Amino acid sequence: MQCPFCNHGELKVIDSRNAPEANAIKRRRECLKCSQRFTTFETVELTLQVLKRDGRYENFQESKLIHGLNAASSHTRIGQDQVHAIASNVKSELLGKQNREISTKEIGELVMKYLKKADMIAYIRFACVYRRFKDVGELMEVLLSATPDMEK
C-alpha cells in the first residue's frame, strides 16, 4: 500500500477497529514520509460464483445487488443506509454458506426475506422483477402471502 498523498510505500498503523456495519476492519494510517494520515478499510474478498438463469457463471457483484435494491425501494421509506444494510446482510449470509457457488434464485430469496421485513412495496416490486410473473394470478399469490391479515 502507498500513501495517497505522496505515494511513499512506508506507512504505520496508528489505530485499528472493527467496523461491523461494513463487515470490515477500519485502520488509521500515517505516512512515514509526509506524515499525512488517512483511513483504510479491510474487507473479506467475496469469491462467490453466481449461477445465472442461463447456466453461465459470473463473479458476485455487490453493486448489482445494491442496484436491484435501489430500483425496488425507490420512492419508499427505505433509505440508502437501509439498502446498504440489507446488501451487507445478504452478503454476510452468502459468505456464511459452505458452497462458493450460489444461484440467482438463492440471492433473490434472501433479498426478498429482508425486503419483506423492511417495506412491503419494495418487496412486491422486487418480487415482480425477480420472479418474472407470467400472469396476474402469480402476482396475487405473492400479494396474499405478503399480507396474511388481508381477506382472500
From Swiss-Prot:
Protein name according to UniProt: Transcriptional repressor NrdR
Gene giving rise to this polypeptide: nrdR
Function: Negatively regulates transcription of bacterial ribonucleotide reductase nrd genes and operons by binding to NrdR-boxes.
Keyword terms of this UniProt record: ATP-binding, DNA-binding, Metal-binding, Nucleotide-binding, Repressor, Transcription, Transcription regulation, Zinc, Zinc-finger
Limits of the ATP-cone domain: 48-138
Disulfide bridge partners, by residue number: none
Binding note for cofactor: Binds 1 zinc ion.
GO biological process: negative regulation of DNA-templated transcription
Family: Belongs to the NrdR family.
Pfam families per record: ATP-cone, Zn_ribbon_NrdR
Cofactor(s) listed: Zn(2+)
Highest taxon above the source species: Bacteria
Classification via InterPro entries: ATP-cone_dom, NrdR-like_N, RNR_NrdR-like
Source species of the chain: Chlamydia pneumoniae
Positions annotated as zinc finger (unnamed): 3-34
Coiled-coil stretches: none
One example GO MF annotation: DNA binding
